[in-house]
Amino acid sequence: MKYTFNEEKAFDIVAIGRACIDLNAVEYNRPMEETMTFSKYVGGSPANIAIGSAKLGLKAGFIGKIPDDQHGRFIESYMRKTGVDTTQMIVDQDGHKAGLAFTEILSPEECSILMYRDDVADLYLEPSEVSEDYIANAKMLLVSGTALAKSPSREAVLKAVQYAKKHQVKVVFELDYRPYTWQSSDETAVYYSLVAEQSDIVIGTRDEFDVMENRTGGSNEESVNHLFGHSADLVVIKHGVEGSYAYSKSGEVFRAQAYKTKVLKTFGAGDSYASAFIYGLVSGKDIETALKYGSASASIVVSKHSSSEAMPTAEEIEQLIEAQS
C-alpha cells in the first residue's frame, strides 16, 4: 500500500517548531561533571527532520523563530547549506535566546540531556508570522509536539494546521514529547489530542501515545481506533528494540524490525526515523518499505555522535537494509 500526496505542491515537507543548539559530549563514558569538551550541532526535532529530509533529497522548508545572535546565525546558515529553505525563519527582535541541549554519554544505554529552555526564541513564534501561502505550497506540514508547549508558539502551530487543512496539505504530527516544557500531564494531553485529531499521519513511541491519552499501559489498537475516528489515516507507533508498527485506516498493519547497530548514544533516533519514513512515503515507496527506511535511519544515527550531522543518505539506508535482510 502506498500513501499519496498532491504532486503539484512545490515543497515535499515544511516543518514548524524549534531549531536550537545541541552540545554533544566529545568524551564518552564519563559524567557531565567531568566532561570538558562538546561539539556544536543544530538540534530540535523539527529542524532535525527538515535537515534529514533535505539530505535524502526532499524539498524541505522550515518555519520557526531563531535568536538575533551568533547561535541564530549558525542555525540558519547550517540549515540553508544542507538544502533546507530558511526564508520563513523569523529572527527574534526581543532578546530571546536559542535553546541549548547538553548531552551526556555515560554508556550506549545510559545517555541524558541537560536542557536550557527558559524564554527561548522558538516558543515566541507568533501566529501572524506563519505564512498561509508557504504552507499551501507544501505536500505536508510537519508539526512537533514541543511547539505546543507554550503561547504564542502554540497558537502559531494551530494556525499553521488550519492553513494546511484549508489547502489540502497533509498534517504529520511527530509527538516529540519533552516533559520539561510542559506544566502538567493534563495540559499536554489536551493540546496533543487537539492536533492529533486534526492530523493525517501521527508518529510517536508507545510511551508518547500514553502521554497524549493521559494514561499508562494503553494499547495500539485503542490508540489507532480513536484517531481513525477523526482525521488520521496512518498511525505509526514505535516500540524501541521490538520494532515499529504502521496502521492504515483501511485496516492494514505493517511492521518493521529494529536494525542491529553498534549503539553510541540513544538520542536522535526519533528524528531520523521520521525523516526517512517521510522520504519513503513521498518517494512512492509502500508503507512497509517506508517503515524499514525509518528504522534503518534511526539505527544509523544512534551509532554516530550527532543527530543533525549524522542524518544518512538514501544509499546508506538502503545498504543497511540490504545487509540485514
UniProtKB/Swiss-Prot annotation:
GO molecular function: 5-dehydro-2-deoxygluconokinase activity; ATP binding
EC number per UniProt: 2.7.1.92
PROSITE patterns found in the cross-reference section: PFKB_KINASES_2
SUPFAM superfamilies xref list: Ribokinase-like
Alphabetical list of InterPro entries matching this protein: Carboh/pur_kinase_PfkB_CS, DKG_kinase_firmi, Myo_inos_IolC, Myo_inos_IolC-like_sf, PfkB_Carbo_kinase, PfkB_dom, Ribokinase-like
Pathway membership, UniProt: Polyol metabolism; myo-inositol degradation into acetyl-CoA; acetyl-CoA from myo-inositol: step 5/7
Keywords: ATP-binding, Kinase, Nucleotide-binding, Transferase
Top class in the EC scheme: transferase
Pfam families: PfkB (PF00294)
An individual GO BP term: inositol catabolic process
Signal sequence segment: none
Coiled coil: none
Reaction equations catalysed: 5-dehydro-2-deoxy-D-gluconate + ATP = 6-phospho-5-dehydro-2-deoxy-D-gluconate + ADP + H(+)
Function: Catalyzes the phosphorylation of 5-dehydro-2-deoxy-D-gluconate (2-deoxy-5-keto-D-gluconate or DKG) to 6-phospho-5-dehydro-2-deoxy-D-gluconate (DKGP).
Family: Belongs to the carbohydrate kinase PfkB family.
Protein name: 5-dehydro-2-deoxygluconokinase
Organism in which the protein naturally occurs: Bacillus subtilis (strain 168)
Lineage, broadest ranks: Bacteria, Bacillati, Bacillota, Bacilli, Bacillales
Gene: iolC
